[in-house]
């Protein structure tokens, strides 16, 4: 085939030289057409010309896609999560990992609160490293998320979440004391009640409370339109710090459980958002999830 194409092309070039025509692509093709070819030669020439005149291919869509989310950008909840504003308070064993995982999902904005600085002892169960020691946890986590998730829409506040702090529709906490949980929950509830009963705004509110020990955890989640869950949470789960079960100082936290509870909490958040994206079957957003590492037993209550 190459010999035939070469011969045809040579004939065309000779005709062009004799006629002293300008070497434009259109005149070149007209000269080739003037050559008497057999059907087989015409077919071969057409294939050769097509190969020579291929247009530059259209850029792959992946060129314009954020490569840091490309492995899950096809999820039904992907775009909706990027519209969410999330408040996360308490950046210890629970909050550090939750913040990292949320950063990977890239919500519209992530607001984080914690007044504490990183200490060496935190490395026994929290996400922080040696270079973070001495820094505020909120600043250290923000820098980590920027580095590991290429996510910059994070507001890092080196303060406690107080009664006068601003609430958002979605609030997640990982506190180690009941007083802070109570304040955080009350602010979220006030925001929920500021919306008309039965409104879509209420339905789009979510509260997640994570509680962690060395080898067990509990996750409580309340949707804005679930009054039953609010009552149960207030009556059964907002007890005082004096009533909270004490733990042995050297057996308070492990990294693998901190990582695990964070994954479950973010899973609940993802399921909640997915339910606004028209899933074939609604996803579960359980009120209560508990896990015991010694038996590997998981308990779920809706």
Question: What is each model feature region?
Answer:
Residues 2-60, 80, 166-170, 174-302:
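Glycine-rich phosphate/adenylate-binding loop
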Residues 55-79:
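Glycine-rich dinucleotide-binding loop and its adjacent helix/turn
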Residues 82-106, 111-117:
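Glycine-rich adenosine-cofactor-binding loop
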Residues 89, 97, 133-136, 140, ...:
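Conserved active-site and cofactor/substrate-binding residues in soluble primary-metabolism enzymes
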Residues 89-92, 113, 157-159, 173-176, ...:
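Short His-Asn-centered micro-motif
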Residues 109, 153-155, 206:
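Conserved beta-strand segments of alpha/beta enzyme cores
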Residues 112-150:
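Glycine-rich phosphate-binding loop and adjoining beta1-alpha1-beta2 segment
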Residues 136-168, 175-179:
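A structured beta-alpha segment of the ubiquitous adenosine-cofactor-binding alpha/beta core
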């Amino acid at each position: 085939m190459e010999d035939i194409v070469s011969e045809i092309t040579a004939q065309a070039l000779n005709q062009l030289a004799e006629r002293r025509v300008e070497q434009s692509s259109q005149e070149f093709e007209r000269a080739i057409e003037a050559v008497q070819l057999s059907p087989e030669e015409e077919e071969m020439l057409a294939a050769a010309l097509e190969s020579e005149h291929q247009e530059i291919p259209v850029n792959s869509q992946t060129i314009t896609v954020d490569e840091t989310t490309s492995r899950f950008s096809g999820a039904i909840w992907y775009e909706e999560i990027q519209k969410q504003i999330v408040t996360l308070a308490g950046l210890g064993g629970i909050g550090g990992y939750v913040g990292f995982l949320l950063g990977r999902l890239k919500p519209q904005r992530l607001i984080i609160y914690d007044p504490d600085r990183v200490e060496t002892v935190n490395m026994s169960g929290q996400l922080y490293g040696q270079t973070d020691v001495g820094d505020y946890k909120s600043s250290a986590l923000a820098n980590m998320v920027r580095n590991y998730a290429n996510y910059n829409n994070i507001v890092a506040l080196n303060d406690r979440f107080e009664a006068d702090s601003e609430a958002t529709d979605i609030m997640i906490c990982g506190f180690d004391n009941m007083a802070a949980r109570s304040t955080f929950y009350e602010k979220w509830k006030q925001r929920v009640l500021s919306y008309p009963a039965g409104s879509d705004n209420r339905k789009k509110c979510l509260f997640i409370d994570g509680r962690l020990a060395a080898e067990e955890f509990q996750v409580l989640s309340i949707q804005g339109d679930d009054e039953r869950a609010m009552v149960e949470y207030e009556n059964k789960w907002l007890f005082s710090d004096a009533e909270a079960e004490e733990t042995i100082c050297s057996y308070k936290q492990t990294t693998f459980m901190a990582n695990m509870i964070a994954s479950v909490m973010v899973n609940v958040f993802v399921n909640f958002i997915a339910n606004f994206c028209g899933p074939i079957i609604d996803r579960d957003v359980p009120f209560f999830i508990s896990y015991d590492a010694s038996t590997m037993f998981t308990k779920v209550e809706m």
